[in-house]
Amino acid sequence: MRLLVVLSRVPYPLEKGDKLRAYHLVSRLAERHEVFLFCLSDQPIDPEHVKHLQGICQHIEVVHLPRWRIVLRLITAAFSRLPFQVAYFHQRHAHRRFNEVIASFKPEHVICQLVRTTEYVRHHYELPKTLDYMDTLSKGMERRTETAPFYLRPLLRAETHRLIAYENLMFDLFDNNIIISAQDRDFLYHPDRDHVAVIPNGVDLSYFSPREGERHHDLLFTGNMNYPPNIDSVLFLARRVLPLV
């Protein structure tokens, strides 16, 4: 089967959770299918990273999103109902290139990671589609609103409502929906959320295995520390859990 996988980031190197999930998804799918990896990027990409990805899938395209176009897109999004997180990653030149890939590759199925990428396939009704929500972005935005400075709360609250509406819209447009955890599935506002398939993350035991030797750390927390839930987790661990140990 010809599969087109659409990502909002280049999934290498593996320093963020969405990259890790996408990397292993693509590598496993490419073992049995012809995979075209379509990536968006708002920063320069090391050619060696692209070369590495060429070794795990048959085709790859990286479309650069210039900063000035991102700013312009966010300004225009203020006068629409499109969530800013979606507008950030959606640009006309990228959409044109995406449509060219559709025409030339002729995918039999499209897989989008996060609703940030779904605007590209929104009007391709003829294509079977799967959306990996990963987590519920609207719930994350709602939580950020609670702790944000007062002057940012109206903006974040508006983004929360936009995300809820958009997540529900994409739910209906996609043939299949998957998510990482049952908890995140329950945070979706769609009445048919129980139909979302839960596919959790795992650990590659062929790569990660216990090692003998002296231990220099009793505990290590690793993750993207620009991501608010990770910050909350490590603070909870330090303040509430470690004092009990």
Locations of regions flagged by a protein language model:
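N-terminal subdomain of nucleotide-sugar transferases
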Residues: 1-61
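Cofactor-binding loop segments of dinucleotide-utilizing enzymes, especially the Rossmann-like FAD-
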Residues: 8, 40-42, 65, 182, ...
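Acceptor-binding helix/loop patch of EC 2.4 sugar-transfer enzymes
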Residues: 8, 67-84, 88, 129-169, ...
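A conserved catalytic-core segment of Leloir-type glycosyltransferases
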Residues: 39-100, 104-105
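Short, charged/polar "capping" segments at the starts of alpha-helices
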Residues: 43-49, 119-120, 139, 185-188
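Short N-terminal targeting/anchoring amphipathic segment
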Residues: 98-118, 127-130
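Donor nucleotide-sugar binding/catalytic pocket of nucleotide-sugar-dependent glycosyltransferases
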Residues: 130, 138, 156-209
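Conserved catalytic-core segment of nucleotide-activated headgroup transferases in glycan assembly
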Residues: 172, 194-245
